[in-house]
Amino acid sequence: MRDPVETYMNLVPMVVEQTNRGERAYDIFSRLLKERIIFVTGPVEDGMSTLIVAQLLFLEAENPKKEISMYINSPGGVVTSGLAIYDTMQFIRPPVSTLCTGQAASMGSLLLAAGHKDMRFSLPNARIMVHQPSGGFQGQATDIMLHAQEILNLKKRLNEIYVHHTGQTYKAIEDALERDKFLTAEMAREFGIVDKVIEKRPEDPAPAPKAA
């Protein structure tokens, strides 16, 4: 059976551009990276996290002041992998705008909320879901207790991050994350995860008329 990842990569469109040295082909994601657009798609795990962090650091090195756009469509995943992306977003100098397309669940919603203030957006039919971290462990009782305490520590830290970015009280965040909480784009705006729900890309302002 063919590897589904290999199949997917073979389906990624190529973009051909004319340069002074002739034609140059890019896969579509590399071409968009040139425009400072990063995609966070699929489950959040170590491999994907490393690629996102590397792209953020590269774009910072290329221009430490120019905005980076992050498009998010993710069901969430590994907490530590998501926190690696989150910390890098806060660490680098360029402002990072976030936009939810499809869904931003679990760690995906945290990354959506982590965008630069007034630069966090959602498309109208996107869905956002927040909840507390989960984990399953087996082994000796002492080890299970240690892992359970670590989950509680992570839960507290994630709550604090949501408080910081949403403006909600700690109690409100704790109550919201107690179970899976599904939000429409407008509800996510009211909750403070995004700043604006957008249907169309804003048009460029018309140039000022020239003086006679």
From Swiss-Prot:
It holds the Pfam family CLP_protease. Keywords: Cytoplasm, Hydrolase, Protease, Serine protease. The active site is at S106 (nucleophile), H131. GO terms for biological process: protein quality control for misfolded or incompletely synthesized proteins. Signal peptide: none annotated. GO terms for molecular function: ATP-dependent peptidase activity; ATPase binding; serine-type endopeptidase activity. GO terms for cellular component: cytoplasm; endopeptidase Clp complex. It catalyses: Hydrolysis of proteins to small peptides in the presence of ATP and magnesium. alpha-casein is the usual test substrate. In the absence of ATP, only oligopeptides shorter than five residues are hydrolyzed (such as succinyl-Leu-Tyr-|-NHMec, and Leu-Tyr-Leu-|-Tyr-Trp, in which cleavage of the -Tyr-|-Leu- and -Tyr-|-Trp bonds also occurs). Its EC number is 3.4.21.92. Coiled coil: none annotated. It comes from the Bacteria. Its main location: cytoplasm. Gene3D superfamilies: 2-enoyl-CoA Hydratase, Chain A, domain 1. PROSITE patterns: CLP_PROTEASE_HIS (PS00382). The keyword Protein transport does not apply. It is found in: Cytoplasm. NCBIfam families: PRK00277.1, PRK12553.1. Belongs to the peptidase S14 family. Cleaves peptides in various proteins in a process that requires ATP hydrolysis. Has a chymotrypsin-like activity. Plays a major role in the degradation of misfolded proteins. Fourteen ClpP subunits assemble into 2 heptameric rings which stack back to back to give a disk-like structure with a central cavity, resembling the structure of eukaryotic proteasomes. This is ATP-dependent Clp protease proteolytic subunit. It comes from Rhodopseudomonas palustris (strain TIE-1). The lineage of its organism: Bacteria, Pseudomonadati, Pseudomonadota, Alphaproteobacteria, Hyphomicrobiales.
